[in-house]
Amino acid sequence: MSRKLITINQVKDYVGQEVTIGAWVANKSGKGKLAFLQLRDGTAFFQAVAFKPNFIEKFGEEAGTEKFDVAKRLSQETSVYVTGIVKEDERSKFGYELDVTDLEVIGESQDYPITPKEHGTDFLMDNRHLWLRSRKQVAIQQIRNAIIYATYEFFEKNGFIKFDSPILSGNAAEDSTELFETDYFGQLAYLSQSGQLYLEAGAMALGRVFDFGPVFRAEKSKTRRHLTEFWMMDAEYSFLSHEESLDLQEAYVKALIQGVIDRAPQALETLERDVDALKRYIAEPFKRVAYDDAITLLQEHEADKDTDYEHIEHGDDFGSPHETWISNYFGVPTFVVNYPASFKAFYMKPVPGNPERVLCADLLAPEGYGEIIGGSMREDNYDALVAKMDELGMDKSEYEFYLDLRKYGSVPHGGFGIGIERMVTFVAGTKHIREAIPFPRMLHRLHP
């Protein structure tokens, strides 16, 4: 079969022309002289129509009938080369369809386990390698790709250099109780929770750096917002103030949303995402509220009939219901700033004049998606950082390189991190984070 091989998302450039598409059969229907093939190739889904008389006219009665019978017998996920004439189709959401002129089976698929009927979550997760082929799962991964692309584009435009932090580390970045341990030639090593400590070294060398890679948290959590392995973007920068950092974070999140709208509009449509809401999050300024003011707001509204969060006191950390209420109250992504030092990381710089609060921020996404970014200014004074580590009983010998950064030309600096899967979940409008990564690793889920 001689062919002009294209992908489905290219068909708009070939209206009226004969092309060939390599694809899988997602579904099929029809009767009599017609067969409707729902095709997918990773770029999009669309319909190809096989009409028996056209096959007979081209190949003769016997060969044409045999070709058409092959089309009618195609099973779900059979791979094919389909040749045909591209036509515009206003009835289709995709806008085009293919009038089939030839067909070649590449690989047959028998008894495909994920049929169009409903399946339970455990079954779908056990067959994740196949579930990824479904229309909605493809859309989610396309959104993930758009977010990753927009990440690199944003940091390139803003003068950041990609800086690769190690996955194996001899110390903890944050909470030592959530570390995966491994033997490193007789030494105890940990899988990285965050590249932040190493990025601070990068910022002292290169000014503005970012990292993007997998991180690991040994959290025994089964919520819809937690994974044990996920992909984190961490950024670190020298000479920026706290307010400038918040401006940068806001611009970054808006760039990610715009990137998805620009690069994956069909995916958003497939997922029935409210694009007008996403556009509003871009257009309107993000809200900024101090932690103590947020606590006061929660206390003032806890008796409202539509609230479902527990009472909270100043000094307490937020639970998911508190975060949901705060972001929904303001209606846009909301920065909560200046949390208590008591439950934040040791390296965060105190608020000037208020050592019980630190210069940090969590960005809470609306619609119940909760925290998507965490960031802070870092303590840049050597003596102050040593005193904090002593107060917490930390072994400073494990952080010699980190302390050195404060001894040799320390400067004001800060950074932030975003879990890409949380951002994907928010932009895609999905309910569970497990669908935001190709092969999720969660409590009790290590396969496939």
From Swiss-Prot:
Its main location: cytoplasm. Keywords: Aminoacyl-tRNA synthetase, ATP-binding, Cytoplasm, Ligase, Nucleotide-binding, Protein biosynthesis. GO terms for molecular function: asparagine-tRNA ligase activity; ATP binding; catalytic activity, acting on a protein; nucleic acid binding; transferase activity. PROSITE patterns: AA_TRNA_LIGASE_II. One of its GO terms (cellular component) is cytoplasm. The keyword Aminoacyl-tRNA synthetase applies. It is found in: Cytoplasm. Its EC number is 6.1.1.22. GO terms for biological process: asparaginyl-tRNA aminoacylation. Belongs to the class-II aminoacyl-tRNA synthetase family. Homodimer. This is Asparagine--tRNA ligase. It comes from Streptococcus suis (strain 98HAH33). The gene is asnS.
